[in-house]
Amino acid sequence: MKTNCTICSALAFLLLCSYSVCSGASEQSSGLHTENEAVSIVLDILRSNDQEMQAAAIAMVKEMPGAEVTEALAKELPNLSAKSQVQLLSALGDRGDVVARPAVVTAVKAEDQSVRIAALRALGQLGDDSSVELLAQAAAGAKGAEQKAARDSLYRLRGQNVDKVILAVIPKAEAGIKVELISSVGQRNITTGVAVLLDMAKDSDRKVRTASLRTLKVIAGPEHLPALVELLIGAKSSSDRTEAVKTIAAIAHRISEKNGQAASVLAVLPSVKETVARCSLLNVLGRIGDNSALPVLTAALKDENVDIKTAAIRALADWPTPEPTAELLKIADSSGNKVHRILALRGFVRLLGLASDRPAGDTIEMYKKAMNLAPNAGEKKKVLSGLSNTKSLAALQMAAGYLDDESLFVEAGAAAIHIAGGIYANYPQQATDMLNRIFKTTKSDSLRQQAQEVLNNLEKAEEN
């Protein structure tokens, strides 16, 4: 490849000039003269079509000292091609001289998207609190890489007043910009913003409310739970309630005393009479999983309001530990409400899969009860799916009992294969026999393939 000799010479001169300026070998006036020549050479190279030289020149720009150099380069930024602007913007950002900020701000509004993206990235390095609104506006109005560049820069802006400005601008901003600023509060971990976001969680715009609740999950602490519970009680929509429940549960789990995690919810529950709000509080009790709330949920099962009963069952079904297992089995077995029976059965099966000190034999007996209570093939499939995570010979035998059932053989086979792989170390013969049986007899190509893969993997493990 031929290289422009003039540019080669210019670059060599640039290297010498940069070294001279950096080392202080020249007198002050001579140094200034050299800087001006160096900038001129860089700009000539950036205006050329020689990519190798441009890359070398940009690398040199990052090393050339002096705010005067930055200012001269920034001044010429609009006169360069889009590609050269992108390169120079990156170099200006790395230089860190704030004198380039006005030129970078102007470039944020360039027609060429690649220039806008480069300018947004550079603003993350050169910007301060005056850049907050510009970056939030860019993030709200853009998509893809441009939006990501604006967000990333907003999240990493430096300066002691940046966080304060973000919080001050939020209440006055348009909805889309509010959302971006609120998200930045979480990304920047601005814990002083809790009060602002509690207020924004009541905003008329759904997206603003959602963003506020999600960010509060990050920056709020247990001391804010009473206020968050009040937000849940007054939530405007089901989506608001869903987000509030997630936020409250996440923060409650940070309380070290497990039996005190639900205290803020339990404190207000007796005084809340409105059905939707009461159901929401029961829901969050299930997510928190504080055992001191179990008597409250058990009492709610006897409520005359069917919605309250349903919420209590759902809460027990969501419990993070196996404690409500017996209560759910009772409901699944004896409730006169079909929906309640199914909800309880599903919760019962879910809890059977949680870690416990229950003997393996007792667990299998409970799965058998669940199969007997399952009203249709769909619910029986859910039971077999839960059974597949139980690693015992009895579980393998139970799954095998449904291999000949036309409506269940696929789920039974999948469960048996999974269990066989899990118990092979203790029961190699039984596991191998089951896998071979499925491989030879199943009508499902998928099951046959799964069985063969497990057999192959077990064989390789034995060889090693």
Question: Locations of the language-model features?
Answer:
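Eukaryotic intrinsically disordered, low-complexity regulatory tails and linkers enriched
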Residues: 19-21, 464
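Bacterial N-terminal signal peptides
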Residues: 9-19
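Bacterial N-terminal signal peptides that target proteins for export
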Residues: 1-10
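Structural detector for internal amphipathic alpha-helices that build alpha-solenoid repeat scaffolds
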Residues: 26-35, 44, 52-67, 71-78, ...
